[in-house]
């Protein structure tokens, strides 16, 4: 049996900004009370300007990443244009709902920038999909992350400030949630590019919070 399916526990956040979005997560994976990994990947690139965060079962999440990545590329080949963020979220929602009697134990954030601007959608294991117009957090550390996000988010926030807000939110969650910890992985998506921040830059920004 694949042990990856039992690696759980996470904090992920998404921040909608005026010029893009920020997706971030910590990198601890737990198996019960055991820290199974300190470098778990939880923020994935789905398309050129689309990313996805995963909280919950690592095995289920990786299967979903492969599925939606392939479907997105096939759509682009057939239509000669990228699928919208809403389209990708709907595709994932339909797949999760079709498997609702054998649910994949994941919470997802799908976000990016398309012709309609920046957007983030949150999805639950049953396929419920909600467009998040401001902020979102998933996983066991989300209550602590929301405390920071709700307090410091502004409607006019740009990605330069949004990435620091995301780092602060996850940093705060790791202090109280035993299933969240280690390094923080941060992705910034604008209409120009999908950029994963260098780990050393994230560490430097995080150090300023202590």
Curated annotation (Swiss-Prot):
Per UniProt, the keywords (alphabetical) are: Autocatalytic cleavage, Cytoplasm, Hydrolase, Protease, Proteasome, Threonine protease, Zymogen
Where is this protein found? Cytoplasm
Catalytic residues? 10 (nucleophile)
Identify the InterPro entries for this entry: Ntn_hydrolases_N, Pept_T1A_Psome_bsu_arc, Pept_T1A_subB, Proteasome_bsu_CS, Proteasome_sua/b, Proteasome_suB-type
Q: Which GO terms describe its molecular function?
A: threonine-type endopeptidase activity
* Catalysed conversion reaction: Cleavage of peptide bonds with very broad specificity
Q: What does this protein do?
A: Component of the proteasome core, a large protease complex with broad specificity involved in protein degradation.
Q: Which PANTHER family match?
A: ATP-DEPENDENT PROTEASE SUBUNIT HSLV, METALLOPROTEASE TLDD
Protein's name according to its UniProt entry:
Proteasome subunit beta
| Organism of provenance | Methanosarcina mazei (strain ATCC BAA-159 / DSM 3647 / Goe1 / Go1 / JCM 11833 / OCM 88)
- Gene name per UniProt: psmB
């Amino acid at each position: 049996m694949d042990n990856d399916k039992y690696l759980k526990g996470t904090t992920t956040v998404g921040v909608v900004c005026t010029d893009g979005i920020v997706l971030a997560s910590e990198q601890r994976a737990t198996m019960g009370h055991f820290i199974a990994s300190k470098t778990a990947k939880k923020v994935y690139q789905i398309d050129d300007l689309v990313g996805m965060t995963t909280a919950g079962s690592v095995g289920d999440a990786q299967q979903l990443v492969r599925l939606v990545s392939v479907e997105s590329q096939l759509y682009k080949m057939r239509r000669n244009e990228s699928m919208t963020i809403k389209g990708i979220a709907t595709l994932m929602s339909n797949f999760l709902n079709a498997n609702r009697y054998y649910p994949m134990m994941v919470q997802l954030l799908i976000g990016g920038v398309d012709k309609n601007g920046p957007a983030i959608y949150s999805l639950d294991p049953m396929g419920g999909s909600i467009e998040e117009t401001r902020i979102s957090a998933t996983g066991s550390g989300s209550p602590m992350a929301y405390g920071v996000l709700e307090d410091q988010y502004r409607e006019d926030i740009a990605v330069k400030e949004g990435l620091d807000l995301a780092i602060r939110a996850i940093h705060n969650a790791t202090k109280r949630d035993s299933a969240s910890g280690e390094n923080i992985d941060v992705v910034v998506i604008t209409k120009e590019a999908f950029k994963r921040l260098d780990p050393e830059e994230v560490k430097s920004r995080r150090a300023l919070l202590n």
